Each structure stands twice: as C-alpha cells, then as structure tokens.
A protein has these predicted regions:
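Core catalytic alpha/beta fold that binds nucleotide/phospho-ligands
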Residues: 1-201
Length: 201
C-alpha cells in the first residue's frame, strides 16, 4: 500500500494539495485492487509501468483528499469536459486536478476552479524556452542566476493555468500569463516544482 510517510500535504484556505513521491515504493497490484473497475481499465490501457503507477497514485490521492477533506468516502464517478479537464459529475461544488512528473504525482481539491502542474527539475533547454516563453519571459529566464529553475517556475504556472481553464492547446502558451489575475502558489522541492492555479474571477 502507499506509505503515508511518502505523501506531503499542503493545506490552504482555498485548496488542499497532496504530493506523492517514491513512486516505486508501493505494490501496483495491491493499489490496483483498490480502484473501481472503470479506473482499472484506464490504468490497464497504459503500456508502461511508470505510467500505470502515476495513474494509480493520482486516483488514490484524489480518494484520500475527498475522504479526509470533503467527507466523501468510496469511489466517485469522473467525467471530462470537452477540453479534457476531469470533473466530478455528482459533486459539482468540488473542483480538483491532477498532475505527474517522472518522480512524483500531485492532486489538489479546491472550493473553486483549480489547476495543478508538477515538473521535475531538469537541464535548461533553450529551444523549448523560446517555444513556450514570451520575449520578456525569455529575457527574464536567461538573466536569472538559475535559468533552469526560473524556466520551470514559469512553465508550471503556464501549465497549471491551462489546466485550470481546460483550454489546453487552444491557447497560445506564450501569452497565457498576459493580463492574468489568477492566484498562483508554487512549492519548490529538491526534485520538482509544483504550481497550483486558482480562478480569481
């Protein structure tokens, strides 16, 4: 089973975030047995084990958050908006989002529309930065003492905003932070950055 010692919990007035690292340290079969059939089918359709672990962990974190902080126990139905954003059709006042990276999985529940993105810290990629950053953002990143960390901070902000709105590829990622009034919280770990984006409209 998932070891609670490997879960970090961050409580905010508007949301609760859980992060699980050590993705190799739980029994995939045991955790799969705890899933509803529809989620098990989703996991089984994933071909590589790491992806299966990420999918299982994301749903298990959601179940923990719903039980501990929303008073909802047992399995819940999940549906998807046209843009691919998941939601809980039987609990319209509960907002949630999930994300994963190579080394960890994050799940957030909130009182308002929310998005989350988690990214592993990796080497700075100049061509990727030019592709996703505005000119001003690119100059800010390359002038930073740590371009890789500043880039990942902005990247997780952009991704969490796109996941909050559910617009995905329909939005120009270079301009997604322009005139933005969303609320952002970023958590920095030795291995990853996590950003939560809350709707402030």
């Amino acid at each position: 089973m998932i070891n609670p010692e490997h879960i970090s919990t961050y409580e905010h007035d508007d949301y609760v975030l859980m992060i699980l690292d050590h993705l190799q340290n739980f029994s995939l079969d045991d955790e799969m047995a705890c899933l509803p059939p529809w989620r098990r089918d989703v996991v089984m359709a994933i071909h590589h084990e790491q992806g299966k672990r990420q999918s299982v962990a994301a749903y298990r974190l959601l179940m923990m958050l719903l039980e501990r902080h929303c008073g909802i126990s047992g399995h819940v139905a999940m549906a998807y908006h046209d843009g691919g954003k998941p939601y809980l059709p039987h609990h319209p006042n509960i907002h949630f989002n999930m994300s994963h990276c190579r080394c960890a999985v994050a799940c957030v529940v909130a009182k308002r529309n929310v998005g989350v993105d988690i990214e592993s810290i990796r080497r700075f990629n100049d061509s990727l930065a030019r592709h996703v950053l505005s000119d001003d953002e690119y100059l800010m990143v390359t002038a930073s003492p740590s371009p890789q960390r500043e880039f990942i901070r902005l990247w997780t902000m952009k991704e969490s905003k796109l996941k909050m709105t559910g617009t995905g590829l329909r939005t120009d990622i270079k301009t997604v932070l322009y005139n933005d009034e969303s609320i952002y919280d970023t958590i920095i770990n030795d291995n990853y950055f996590v950003t939560v984006c809350l709707d402030n409209s």
